[in-house]
Structure formats: structure tokens, C-alpha cells
């Protein structure tokens, strides 16, 4: 409720938000109650050009309208029980992930070149369009490509493999090629407006998350700046996932660990920033032929384990024995 007792459904319902302030908020990218509710007073003040006291009041009222508050563990359990899942195309991989790719969560796939990261991204951008009884969400996908690896030919083949009309399936994928790290971050900053206009969006993919940051901020002298920007970028994606009940998938590369003499000599790029932000981290490895190995590296609610899946002409499938 606003101060005058009116139920708050949009920014214009907030007390003290006239057309002038509303225009400033929208122009700054704060076009919904959710965006305002999770902003900091300082960020909102600077971005919209309004006093910090005004920003604090607007944020407080938006949070009250959205019921952002402490919750009991039972309430959290009920919310988790309502988490939706998207099939990967492989029952074995779905089982490893606890039923598929979760909404409200960031899932990271990392591995060497050819380990299946991009193939999985293509497949899941098709799977999200399926009806719920077939493992989808009747939704659309946003695909942010940082390395130029998106291939419409694979989308077309996977759509046919899933029984979808290829042109319709491709029309349900919003694609953007990010040319540098600033552009990549700007795309995500603008996503909220797109999601507000098209609530059918249920999946965001960034393939890959770190490539531009590594190229533009090399060396130890740039490490702090790189990690700060990457951390902000990751948290913006998590915020979108939680606000709009969307699944977020990021892919990541690996690098050698010269200090490792036993076990896996590689580790995911991104350091501690990427170790802690994704809710689920999955390592992918090549196997024989079209087979790939997926291993849970970190997920607080899932047991460790690994499975084998296959990449076929029609998409990601269970591996044949």
C-alpha cells in the first residue's frame, strides 16, 4: 500500500512519484517495482538524478509493495518447492541437476573447448519453449553470445529434434552478440525492460561469461578491476533470475593449474568471484566420440556425482550404452 492507502501495482502508484520522477526512473532503466526494490539509494539517486532521501523512500515503498521481508524457513521451503525446471534433453543430466535447469538460479557450465558448453546452451534455449509436460516452460530465451559461437543451423536441427517448427523456435530466441565487456554488461542492464515487455522470457544465457573480461583486463595489475566488474555483472544476472523467476545459464572456460600434480590440472576461469555466485556449478569434459561427462562441482542442495550424456545431430540426449 502507498501512504494514501492505494494498492501499489506500478511505479506510478508510489507516493510522490509524479510524471517527472517516473520519466527519470524509466530513462535510468528502473522501469518496474522489482528494479527499484533491489536498487541501493545511492545508485538510484545517481542514475535517476533525484535526492537520496527521495530514493530511500521510493525503495522502501517498492519493497513493501512486493513483500520483500524476512521469511520463515517454511516459507522458503514452499518457494523452493515451486522452483521450475527446464530439461537439458538428457534424462541422466536432468537427474544429476535435480530435475533440470532451475529457475531463480544461476547455473554455470565450465570446461575445455569442445566439452559441450555451447551445445547445451543451444539445446536448453529450445527446451525452454516446450510445454511443461515435456520439460519446458512454454517460454522464450535470451542468448548473449560473447565469442560468436551461436549457430542458427544447430538451433534449427535441435528444434526439429524436439518436434518444434524451426522458424517459430528461432523467433522465440532473442539473440545479441556482445562485442566487449562494457557492451555485455549494458545488454544485461537493459534486459529488465525487455523482460517487462515480454514476460514469456524464462531463460537467459551468457556464452561465455568471462572471455571479454579476460581479454580486456590481462595481468595482475588489472585483476581487481576485472573482478569488480565481473562480480557486478554476475549479481545483476542473479537479481534478474530471482525477480522474474528466470533460469540463468553461464558458460566459462578453464585454465591450467601449474601447481597441481595430482587430480584435475584445470580450473574454471574467474577466481573466487565465480566460485561463489552461481548456485550450481557443473564441469564438462570430453569423452569418446559424441559422449560428454558432466560432474557437479558445487551445489548446496545436490549431491556430488557425474553422468555421461551425448551430443547428437538432434541435440543433447542420453548416451547409448
Swiss-Prot record:
UniProt: ATP binding residues: 111-118
Keywords (A to Z) from UniProt: ATP-binding, DNA damage, DNA recombination, DNA-binding, Nucleotide-binding
Domain of life: Archaea
InterPro entries xrefs: AAA+_ATPase, DNA_recomb/repair_Rad51_C, DNA_recomb/repair_RadA, DNA_recomb/repair_RecA-like, DNA_repair_Rad51/TF_NusA_a-hlx, P-loop_NTPase, RecA_ATP-bd, RecA_monomer-monomer_interface
Pfam families (UniProt xref): HHH_5, Rad51
Alphabetical GO biological process terms: DNA recombination; DNA repair
GO MF annotation, one: ATP-dependent DNA damage sensor activity
Function: Involved in DNA repair and in homologous recombination. Binds and assemble on single-stranded DNA to form a nucleoprotein filament. Hydrolyzes ATP in a ssDNA-dependent manner and promotes DNA strand exchange between homologous DNA molecules.
Protein family: Belongs to the eukaryotic RecA-like protein family.
UniProt-recorded name of the protein: DNA repair and recombination protein RadA
Amino acid at each position: 500500500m502507498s501512504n494514501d492507502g492505494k494498492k501499489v501495482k506500478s511505479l506510478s502508484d508510489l507516493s510522490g512519484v509524479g510524471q517527472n520522477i517516473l520519466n527519470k526512473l524509466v530513462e535510468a532503466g528502473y522501469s518496474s517495482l522489482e528494479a527499484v526494490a533491489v536498487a541501493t539509494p545511492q545508485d538510484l539517486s545517481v542514475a535517476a538524478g533525484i535526492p537520496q532521501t527521495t530514493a530511500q523512500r521510493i525503495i522502501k515503498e517498492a519493497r513493501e509493495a512486493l513483500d520483500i521481508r524476512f521469511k520463515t524457513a517454511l516459507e522458503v521451503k514452499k518457494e523452493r518447492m515451486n522452483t521450475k525446471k527446464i530439461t537439458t534433453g538428457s534424462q541422466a543430466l536432468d537427474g544429476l541437476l535435480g530435475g533440470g535447469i532451475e529457475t531463480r538460479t544461476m547455473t554455470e557450465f565450465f570446461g575445455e573447448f569442445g566439452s559441450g558448453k555451447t551445445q547445451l546452451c543451444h539445446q536448453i534455449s529450445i527446451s525452454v519453449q516446450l510445454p511443461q509436460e515435456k520439460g519446458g516452460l512454454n517460454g522464450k530465451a535470451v542468448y548473449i553470445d560473447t565469442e560468436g559461437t551461436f549457430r542458427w543451423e544447430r538451433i534449427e536441427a535441435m528444434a526439429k529434434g524436439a518436434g518444434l517448427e524451426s522458424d517459430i523456435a528461432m523467433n522465440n530466441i532473442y539473440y545479441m552478440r556482445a562485442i566487449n565487456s562494457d557492451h555485455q554488461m549494458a545488454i544485461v542492464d537493459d534486459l529488465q525492460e525487455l523482460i517487462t515487455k515480454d514476460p514469456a522470457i524464462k531463460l537467459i544465457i551468457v556464452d561465455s561469461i568471462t572471455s571479454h573480461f579476460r581479454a580486456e583486463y590481462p595481468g595482475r595489475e588489472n585483476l581487481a578491476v576485472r573482478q569488480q566488474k565481473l562480480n557486478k555483472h554476475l549479481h545483476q544476472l542473479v537479481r534478474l533470475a530471482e525477480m522474474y523467476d528466470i533460469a540463468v545459464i553461464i558458460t566459462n572456460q578453464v585454465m591450467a593449474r601449474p601447481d597441481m600434480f595430482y587430480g584435475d590440472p584445470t580450473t574454471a576461469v574467474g577466481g573466487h568471484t565465480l566460485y561463489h555466485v552461481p548456485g550450481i556449478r557443473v564441469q564438462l569434459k570430453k569423452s569418446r566420440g559424441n559422449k560428454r561427462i558432466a560432474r557437479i562441482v558445487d551445489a548446496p542442495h545436490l549431491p556430488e556425482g557425474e553422468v555421461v550424456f551425448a551430443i547428437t545431430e538432434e541435440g543433447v540426449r542420453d548416451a547409448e550404452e
